[in-house]
Each structure stands twice: as structure tokens, then as C-alpha cells.
Amino acid sequence: MVDLGKVFILGDSYSTFEGHIPEGYATWYYDVIQKDTDVDKVEQTWWKKVLDNTESELVLNCSYSGTTICHTGYSGDCSKASFVGRFDDIVADGWFSNKTVDTFIVFGGTNDSWANSPIGEVMTSGWTKETLFSYLRAVNYLIKRVQDLFPGVRVICITNCDLKPEITDGLRDAAERYGAELIELQDIEKRSGHPDIKGMEQIAEQVLNYLEER
């Protein structure tokens, strides 16, 4: 069985489930269905299936429905909820001061694609908050920041299917630049753009197949 050790997940709606993400974070999946989905048990989620089929311990599922990696979301500035914004907030709050992370999973980019967040240009140093409102700068910053904070951590990026090519290409480029891993999902079943039970099974299967081949 693949050993992932202590796992941190940074994601969007695809990785949420009510009661299993930080309080106040928006979710798509509930015990009592409230969205267009048939997923109503946490055991049906892709991430729980992956955890249950590996040697792993979840440190935190820091997933927030509707969020972009960069600071530009559907209504403009989303710097408090964005992937980089909330990760930086957790770091600044000292949450990691007594935590160990062996595997850091980033599953995002879907909302950057859907919200038409600015793509921008690659930036590999000198980031400021103002530079992180575009996707390419933010995704490079995020991967580098994680690696700097957790030397030797295994960073696994997951990208959705059917996104703008510049979103997928940008994540692939950033992963290659910093030695992170990338899983590119294929042909996932969805309802209203979100994986249903079958889609969750497909994501878990593709992730587990990737892990077992490494």
C-alpha cells in the first residue's frame, strides 16, 4: 500500500464535504444533499477514498468551494479565500508550527478557468500580494512556498479535465519547474460541473493508479 504519511489537501468544491473542512468554508457536498449531486457520504468523496486506500493520515482538508488559486475570483478580489490567501493566513497564524506534512495535495485551477481569472505571466521570485491576482504568478508562488516551508515534502498537483489549456499548461509548467508531481484527470463524470458518485470514483481511481505506478 502506498505510504503518503501526513497529508494536507488544498482544494476547491471538488474536495469539500460538510463537517470535514474548516468552519466557515463554503462546501458543495453535504450529508443532506443541497446541490445537484448524488454524493451524500464523505466516504464517496475522491479524497476519502484515496486516504482509505493508502497509508496516510489527514492533517487538514483546507478546501473551500468556489475558490481560485489566484486572488481574482468570480466577483473580483477574493484574496482572503483564494488558495494562496488562505494558505498564507494559516501559515501566519502559526497553524503549522507543531504540524508535520509529508504529502501536500493541491487540487485547483477549475475556478480560475471558469471565473476567467487573468492568466498573466510567469513570475518565479519577488512576489507580493499585488502580483498574485493572476493565475501563473499565483500557481508558481504557491508550489514554491509549500516547498520552502516543508523541505522534502511531496507536492502532488491535480488538475481537472475540460479546463482552458493555459490553466492546465501553467500548472504543468510550474510543477516541472519546482519538481512537483502532476495528475491530469481525464473524462470525469459530473453534474453541474461537479463530480457525482461515479466521478468521485474515477478521480480516486486515477489518483491511486498514478500513486501505485510511482
Regions found by a protein language model. Give the residues of each.
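Structural motif
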Residues: F8-L10, I105
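Short active-site segment of divalent metal-dependent hydrolases/proteases
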Residues: Y14-S15, G199
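Conserved SGNH/GDSL esterase-like catalytic core that processes O-acyl groups on lipids
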Residues: Y25-G120
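Alpha-helical cap/lid subdomain in secreted, periplasmic
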Residues: S82-R214
